[in-house]
Amino acid sequence: MEIGQYQPNLEGDGLRIGIVQSRFNEPVCNGLADACVEELERLGVSGEDVLLVSVPGALEIPLALQKLAESGQFDALIALGAVIRGETYHFELVSNESGAGITRIGLDFNLPIANAVLTTENDEQAVARMTEKGRDAARVAVEMANLTMALDQLGDDEDEEEDEEDEEERA
């Protein structure tokens, strides 16, 4: 049996990407953003198609993502932040709530969101992971934007077939 399969597409040309970056643990978040933007450019996303906004901390990321999603101007969004256990007593709350909010926005708006909010035990772990996680967020956003657009076309193709069948029945 032969089955259809969608191949991952990392071509970023023409995609519009919104990035929300936390300023808490700023050196790590700047490292995430630098790596992310560099990778978006490498994948063909134009600088004029990227909007980067910053928020005070990880708990503010979901609201900013929601506003970007509501605008309808983006093919994918990216969340960048760093929650480090050693620096906050409410590590679990911030980690869990920001993650749940990011996921909810993506599902509510049917919009891919690459979540690169690092949750680490210490600064050293965050610094060690920031570059690769920033790059990975860019790749996830581009791949998922392309995938969701391709899957949306499946529905469009089915609608066109139904319209053609309806026209044939009326004729």
UniProtKB/Swiss-Prot annotation:
Cited SUPFAM superfamilies: Lumazine synthase (SSF52121)
Binding site for (2S)-2-hydroxy-3-oxobutyl phosphate: 87-88, 129
BP term (GO), one: riboflavin biosynthetic process
Positions of transmembrane segments: none
GO cellular-component term (any): riboflavin synthase complex
Annotated positions binding 5-amino-6-(D-ribitylamino)uracil: 24, 58-60, 82-84, 115
Listed pathway(s): Cofactor biosynthesis; riboflavin biosynthesis; riboflavin from 2-hydroxy-3-oxobutyl phosphate and 5-amino-6-(D-ribitylamino)uracil: step 1/2
Renumbered residue ranges of the record's region Disordered: 150-171
InterPro entries: LS (IPR034964), LS/RS (IPR002180), LS/RS_sf (IPR036467)
Keyword line: Riboflavin biosynthesis, Transferase
Reaction catalysis annotation: (2S)-2-hydroxy-3-oxobutyl phosphate + 5-amino-6-(D-ribitylamino)uracil = 6,7-dimethyl-8-(1-D-ribityl)lumazine + phosphate + 2 H2O + H(+)
Catalytic residues (positions): 90
Enzyme Commission number(s): 2.5.1.78
Extent of Acidic residues compositional bias: 154-171
MF terms in GO: 6,7-dimethyl-8-ribityllumazine synthase activity
Gene3D superfamilies in UniProt: Lumazine/riboflavin synthase
Main function: Catalyzes the formation of 6,7-dimethyl-8-ribityllumazine by condensation of 5-amino-6-(D-ribitylamino)uracil with 3,4-dihydroxy-2-butanone 4-phosphate. This is the penultimate step in the biosynthesis of riboflavin.
Similarity annotation: Belongs to the DMRL synthase family.
Protein name, UniProt field: 6,7-dimethyl-8-ribityllumazine synthase
Organism: Burkholderia ambifaria (strain ATCC BAA-244 / DSM 16087 / CCUG 44356 / LMG 19182 / AMMD) (Burkholderia cepacia (strain AMMD))
